[in-house]
Amino acid sequence: YRLACGVFVGNSHGVGVKGTNATSEFLDVVSCYKGKWYKIGFKKGKLTTPVKETTAPSDEFKVGRMKSGTLIHYKPDPTIFSVKSFPPSMLVEWAQMQAYLNPGLTLTVNIKGKQKSFFSKGGPRDYIANQLAALKSEAEADLFEFSNELATIAVAFSNADGFLLKGFTNGLTNSQGGKHVDSVAAALFKAIQTHKGAKQEFSNND
């Protein structure tokens, strides 16, 4: 899980490039390695263009002249997905969330010629601030943040009703919760219990 390439494709927590390739009409990858550009291509999950040296991507992909990095270009297989499977709002929401999860990274979505870019300098801190702003609420105390090579945790308390708990593993949403989310929630409740007043009672459902 700690390998950079593993983190990028989502490891076992998501389909990554393998799943995308298997469900795409075509998938092309162009990448720069040690100053040289290489390309590999697939159709319907089958290799059609073995790795070969090529030139940097340009106007062909509408990304401008790239000097380094990797470009992945694919088309979802229409026999598997319908147009309704990819509403623009879903793509915009995904790009916006990825910007929060990867501070400093700019993501640009191009929908029918209209571009929209997303960037976050503060990452999860910015996300929480925007959520509080949407609720017209302010955090009651300084935001708690913890981060190391394995995890980043951000917690804020406000005077708004209810709560919002979101978890992500390698950039992929844990929509059904799971061990990662449950462990953080349990630790938070345990910490609150140690500081509660003698007449106050809390449970995991509070």
Predicted region positions:
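GHKL (Bergerat-fold) ATPase N-terminal catalytic module, capturing the glycine-rich phosphate-binding loop
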Residues: Y1-K75, F81
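Short, polar/flexible loop-turn hinges at active-site or ligand-entry regions and domain interfaces
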Residues: A4-V7, P78-P87, S175, A198-F202
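Catalytic cores of large soluble enzymes that bind and process phosphate-bearing ligands
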Residues: F8-S12, G19, V83-P87, F119, ...
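Flexible glycine-/small-residue-rich
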Residues: T23-S24, S31-Y33, Y74-P76, I111, ...
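Short, charged, solvent-exposed linker or helix-capping segments at domain edges/interfaces
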Residues: K39, V83-F86, L165
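GHKL/Histidine-kinase-like ATPase module
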Residues: E53-E60, S89-V92, Q96-A99, G104-D206
